[in-house]
């Protein structure tokens, strides 16, 4: 049973969070001139990559992404923006994440040709987390049936539970059937959408036999229990202790399931890091979604923060907590551990910084400046680079479908 192990790790994570209470925010400071020069250098590199893709890849109905990955212009952009050596990173890996990405998109489009891009990307985000876990475990990077199935359960179940035409009772009945399928009970399938979900569970069963890998299904049931709780309307405000535990359990359970569906079993070292990593991702999501959550009265640590001081304290604690989590990362060798730590550190930094920029009205100007000064390009220049990417991607998508 993983429940006891899970509870112990959540308790330890909560103590780690409490340990961040009085820590001050310390950031490396880049001068505005340095940030401007870095921004211009990255922008120039980004424009070269955009031109490269537009001239050599856009007209191809099946572009070779592995060839694109090897282009010197793209490698230079990654090196400048993410401050890491893509060649050294790739040399430490087995397999290829680009091929895993292509395989996933192909499988989705083959089975659900009308699925919106937003839902595909939602599932793809989880595939990338599982690919990162394959890297940590020293396994060959490849899309497995379990990775495909578990990642697709996100949009498939969300679509059903978000359907305005279904009553709360119907959604509750579906959750009961889903719980039965996860336990191996052959509950009746009522709709085509439910059939798709059931088939995903069967794919997982095909890779991980229940008798040999019981903890895989226990981890899936942890997520399911959180989903059932979410159907209950939030009424009385939760106290801080309750809110913290619910948040930590929700984030940790998702990534722990990722780990089990990659490895079948988890060492204590892996279980601990994936618990912490899941919590960081959940807190970062809550930070990003705080306005929307507050609008619909969805309680999270960040949607309940009512002033600059509270927002800044929570964000500073998240920054320190994410750094403490990364210390626990596991990998088969020191070289790969270094590269993975650098990659996740940069991605966490971007996630948190982007959210601070989005919700800058909830922070004091001083705090915003401190955060911005610690980013190589500064927050506003970083946002400009992201805008260039968004606009260009939308343009490519329009041309692709025309």
Where are these regions (language model features)?
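Hydrophobic core of alpha-helical transmembrane segments in multi-pass integral membrane proteins
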Residues: 73-80, 181, 322, 351
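Primarily interfacial, aromatic-capped hydrophobic alpha-helices that serve as membrane anchors
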Residues: 186-215, 311-356
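All-alpha helical catalytic cores of prenyl diphosphate-utilizing isoprenoid enzymes
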Residues: 84-153, 159-175, 181-294, 360
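Acidic, carboxylate-rich catalytic segments that either coordinate divalent cations
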Residues: 350-402
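Conserved N-terminal diphosphate/IPP-binding helix and adjacent helical/loop segment
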Residues: 1-148, 156, 218-237, 392-402
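Alpha-helical membrane-embedding segments
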Residues: 285, 308-314, 379-381
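Alpha-helical transmembrane segments of multi-pass membrane proteins
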Residues: 249-253, 278, 339-348, 352, ...
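Functional transmembrane or membrane-interface alpha-helices that line membrane-embedded catalytic
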Residues: 170-187, 296-318
């Amino acid at each position: 049973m993983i429940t006891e192990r899970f509870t112990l790790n959540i308790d330890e994570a909560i103590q780690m969070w409490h340990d961040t209470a009085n820590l001050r925010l310390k950031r490396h400071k880049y001068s505005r001139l340095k940030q401007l020069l870095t921004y211009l250098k990255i922008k120039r590199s980004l424009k070269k990559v955009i031109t490269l893709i537009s001239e050599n890849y856009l007209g191809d109905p099946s572009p070779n992404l592995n060839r694109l990955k090897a282009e010197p212009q793209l490698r230079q952009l990654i090196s400048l923006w993410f401050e890491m050596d893509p060649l050294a990173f790739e040399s430490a890996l087995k397999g290829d994440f680009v091929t895993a990405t292509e395989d996933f998109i192909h499988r989705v489009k083959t089975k659900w040709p009308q699925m919106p891009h937003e839902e595909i990307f939602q599932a793809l985000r989880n595939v990338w987390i599982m690919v990162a876990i394959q890297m940590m475990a020293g396994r060959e990077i490849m899309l497995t049936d379990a990775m495909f199935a578990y990642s697709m359960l996100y949009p498939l179940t969300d679509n059903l539970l978000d359907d305005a035409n279904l009553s709360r009772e119907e959604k509750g009945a579906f959750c009961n059937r889903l719980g039965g399928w996860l336990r191996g009970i052959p509950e009746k399938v009522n709709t085509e959408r439910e059939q798709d979900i059931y088939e995903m569970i069967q794919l997982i069963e095909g890779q991980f036999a229940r008798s040999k890998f019981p903890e895989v299904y226990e981890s899936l049931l942890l997520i399911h229990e959180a989903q059932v709780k979410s159907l209950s309307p939030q009424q009385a405000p939760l106290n801080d202790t309750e809110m913290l535990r619910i948040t930590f359990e929700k984030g940790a359970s998702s990534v722990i399931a990722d780990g089990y569906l990659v490895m079948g079993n988890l060492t204590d070292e892996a279980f601990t890091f994936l618990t912490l990593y899941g919590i960081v991702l959940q807190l970062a999501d809550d930070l990003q979604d705080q306005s929307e959550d507050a609008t619909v009265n969805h309680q999270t640590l960040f949607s309940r923060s009512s002033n600059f001081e509270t927002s800044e304290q929570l964000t500073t604690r998240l920054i320190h907590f994410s750094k403490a989590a990364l210390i626990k990362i596991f990998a088969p060798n020191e070289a790969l551990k270094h590269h993975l730590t650098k990659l996740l550190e940069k991605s966490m930094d971007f996630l948190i910084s982007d959210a601070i920029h989005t919700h800058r009205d909830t922070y004091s100007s001083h705090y915003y400046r401190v955060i911005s000064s610690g980013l190589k390009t500064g927050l506003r220049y970083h946002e400009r680079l992201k805008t260039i990417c968004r606009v260009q991607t939308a343009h490519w998508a329009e041309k692709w479908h025309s």
